């Protein structure tokens, strides 16, 4: 084995270790349940089985009045897209899998999603270059 091949192998191992290191201590998410929209939610470390941070905003219409509430939590699955059939409830749910990514329900493409796609693309190019 020549030194170039050994260097490439070490770089590959380092890249894999860096990509895996972030999950060693568990995902961190904000957590609160049914609180007013303006309320701050504390950060928690999720259980190892929880792979998603959930952000849910709910608007309740009761007696011509609107109440806006939010829930932030860790879950093992993404409930986005599950319809609520009550016409007096409007709900928006988003799921993400980066630390503290559920501060708000995104209105467009997530910055973290775009960063993840970019990182994956870049690591693929680096990997092909090394091999």
Curated annotation (Swiss-Prot):
<feature type="domain" description="UPAR/Ly6">
    <location>
        <begin position="27"/>
        <end position="116"/>
    </location>
</feature>
<dbReference type="Pfam" id="PF00021">
    <property type="entry name" value="UPAR_LY6"/>
</dbReference>
<dbReference type="GO" id="GO:0098552">
    <property type="term" value="C:side of membrane"/>
</dbReference>
<feature type="propeptide" description="Removed in mature form">
    <location>
        <begin position="110"/>
        <end position="131"/>
    </location>
</feature>
<keyword id="KW-0732">Signal</keyword>
<dbReference type="GO" id="GO:0005886">
    <property type="term" value="C:plasma membrane"/>
</dbReference>
<keyword id="KW-0472">Membrane</keyword>
<dbReference type="InterPro" id="IPR018363">
    <property type="entry name" value="CD59_antigen_CS"/>
</dbReference>
<keyword id="KW-1003">Cell membrane</keyword>
<feature type="disulfide bond">
    <location>
        <begin position="29"/>
        <end position="53"/>
    </location>
</feature>
<dbReference type="InterPro" id="IPR045860">
    <property type="entry name" value="Snake_toxin-like_sf"/>
</dbReference>
<dbReference type="InterPro" id="IPR051445">
    <property type="entry name" value="LY6H/LY6L_nAChR_modulators"/>
</dbReference>
<keyword id="KW-0336">GPI-anchor</keyword>
<feature type="disulfide bond">
    <location>
        <begin position="46"/>
        <end position="74"/>
    </location>
</feature>
<feature type="disulfide bond">
    <location>
        <begin position="32"/>
        <end position="41"/>
    </location>
</feature>
<keyword id="KW-0449">Lipoprotein</keyword>
<keyword id="KW-0325">Glycoprotein</keyword>
<feature type="signal peptide">
    <location>
        <begin position="1"/>
        <end position="26"/>
    </location>
</feature>
<feature type="lipid moiety-binding region" description="GPI-anchor amidated glycine">
    <location>
        <position position="109"/>
    </location>
</feature>
<keyword id="KW-1015">Disulfide bond</keyword>
<feature type="disulfide bond">
    <location>
        <begin position="96"/>
        <end position="101"/>
    </location>
</feature>
<dbReference type="GO" id="GO:0009986">
    <property type="term" value="C:cell surface"/>
</dbReference>
<protein>
    <recommendedName>
        <fullName>Lymphocyte antigen 6C2</fullName>
    </recommendedName>
</protein>
<feature type="disulfide bond">
    <location>
        <begin position="78"/>
        <end position="95"/>
    </location>
</feature>
<dbReference type="InterPro" id="IPR016054">
    <property type="entry name" value="LY6_UPA_recep-like"/>
</dbReference>
């Amino acid at each position: 084995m020549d030194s170039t091949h050994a260097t490439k192998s070490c770089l590959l191992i380092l890249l894999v270790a860096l990509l895996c290191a972030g999950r060693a201590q568990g995902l961190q998410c904000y957590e609160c349940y049914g609180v007013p929209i303006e309320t701050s939610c504390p950060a928690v470390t999720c259980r190892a089985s929880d792979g998603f941070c959930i952000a849910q905003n709910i608007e309740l219409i009761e007696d011509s009045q609107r109440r806006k509430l939010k829930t932030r939590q860790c879950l093992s699955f993404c409930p986005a897209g599950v319809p609520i059939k009550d016409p007096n409830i409007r709900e928006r749910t988003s799921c993400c899998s980066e630390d503290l990514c559920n501060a708000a329900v995104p209105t467009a493409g997530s910055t973290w999603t775009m960063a993840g796609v970019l990182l994956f693309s870049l690591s693929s190019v680096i990997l092909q270059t090394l091999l």
